[in-house]
């Protein structure tokens, strides 16, 4: 615990996988602790590491306020049984809006990982940005203006997430 926040980890994090020279991918999501329409839903961040070919789950880290303990236990159980991201996609908890959402955050992490493995999405990790040729690329920073003012990547255009629909014309269609 760090004040009111819970930080939890299970399995192998990316740093350890790199040290062991194990080929892996990771995904990070930021779901709510329970149904968003129910009051007092709190943010959490879930990062998982997995084999990019087989989907075997290597590790997971979760930071949040509510429900972190049960989500990290779900990840630990899948890792113990040498499970995959496909097993995560099947995770279900009893649904009650004050405590969970219709799709459990761990299942959502599995869905995002599947999208990465199948090529539906091609993530770019922050550590890779300096190696990417940025010519003919459009780098969009969707943070708030206050967050953007704390520092940004060279050439990034700031359009806060809440304003994207109103400012679609500012987005380059060919980059």
What is the meaning of each model-derived region?
Residues 1-66, 101, 105-131, 137:
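Mid-to-C-terminal Rossmann-like scaffold of FAD/NAD(P)H-dependent oxidoreductases
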Residues 1-10, 81, 86-96:
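Active-site-proximal substrate-binding core of FAD-dependent oxidoreductases
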Residues 18, 79, 149:
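Short polybasic/polar patches that bind polyanions
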Residues 31-33, 92-95, 146, 163-165:
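Residue-level detector of flexible, active-site-proximal loop/helix-junction positions
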Residues 65-84:
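A short, polar/charged loop-to-alpha-helix boundary motif
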Residues 73-77, 90, 111:
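Generic alpha-helical structural context detector
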Residues 130-175:
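Positively charged, proline/Ser/Thr-rich regional signature most characteristic
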